[in-house]
Amino acid sequence: MEGLYRLDKDNKPIPAAAESSTKSEDGKKYTFKLRKDAKWSNGDPVTAKDFVFAWQRLLDKNTAAEYAFIAYYIKNAEAINKGEKPVTELGAKAVDDYTLEVELEKPVPYFLNLLAFPSYYPLNEKFVKEKGDKYGLEADTTVYNGPFVMSSWKHEQGWQLKKNDKYWDKKTVKLEEINYSVVKEVATKVNLYD
């Protein structure tokens, strides 16, 4: 998955799903222009609405997301997460398919860095609603907008990621696949590392 920004090798934020951004003079409002070539692994375009939906879902108290607090910088986010305001009052709106406006509670100099954190990643609303409570529980119940897609997930054993052929920056992705193993015994982990 990929957010509006990612961190480069020097840990500096660089545009990812966003093509560019502007910040208001008071530092409390950001406008992001999204890449028109950013796609989900199912071929759907990644839109500003995907970010709004994901952030509203993150903050919905019924979701009980452990990392919801990381979005409290966004206007009304904390009140929404506490059930004091509806998710529709979140300070994030899709101006059009490729323009996202975000209002903050106060200036946050490291806000672009935060956007690289997974809690700020988008979700394909249509796909999430289609999968319902099964969303994200298996490799085939998730769509991806980043450099890799999960092609196999054997619970308690491991998972496999394959290069996402729909990824906007696929030319720079050098690996074709990544295999992860779940290893519970510390001694086994050490032996595998050597």
Question: What are these language model-derived features?
Answer:
Residues 104-177, 187:
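Gly/Pro-rich hinge or "lid" segments in bacterial periplasmic/extracellular proteins
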